[in-house]
Amino acid sequence: MAEDTAETTPGVPERGRRRRKTAAEPAAPACAMSIHAHPDDQEFTVGGTLAKWARSGCRVITVCITSGGAGSNQSTPLDMTREALVPIREEEQRRACQALGISDVVFLGYEDGVLEPFIALRRDLTRIIRRYKPDAVVCGDPKVRFYGKGYMNHPDHRVAADVALDAVFPSAETRLIFPELLAEGLDPHHVKRVFIHGAPRPDAFVDISSTLDAKLAALREHKSQMGQWDPADMITAWAREQGKSRGLAAAEAYRLMVLEGP
């Protein structure tokens, strides 16, 4: 149900203010699947939402398409290898999920940094969706290449989002796409809602005021990526900016797709 709120223009009497409709926060799903390219992608973008849903009783499944083996930065030892980094990043992701209240974590094992929209990847994501049967899927926006003037969206992020959406529709709900999955006992599944973060014109907002601390705690578990940097100031500023249009102190914003049934 929409909430009717008044514009708070200083000096304008309440009866003279323009009124606008503010959509209510989307209800938490019973089961949600978060699909991203790397360990820490989820925590940067949607960690507050997932923590809030988990606290409400939602089962959340985290899917990392890669294990972040290319995630090096200035604090990474020069002798670090992909093979050594992968178990570190997987353990960091598990600890981050614990901070958010998530117990189901799946790593698909694709190579970090060179992700391509292979049919094998779509099949793997379709398999995971059919196995867990989420009511909602959370992913990025595959069309976003730039954020402002200072950040280029990682190509792995775009591929992960693109293939996740293709797995949701048509693959997960269409019986004769990947018929080999039927032999595994994985029948078609219809995902009811898709929450797309990073979209240019979001239309759904989740108040994360109560879970911002959990989001920050989860991010801090990614020690191999954070180094000595504390993300609190940046993440808090992002949450404040996303909530501003809805009068929220902290929010995560989405384009919400409500998908018609097959």
Model-identified regions with their sequence ranges:
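Active-site rim/loop-helix segments in enzyme catalytic domains that contact anionic ligands
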Residues: 2-133, 255
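Metal-dependent de-N-acetylase/amidase catalytic core
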Residues: 2-35, 104, 118-262
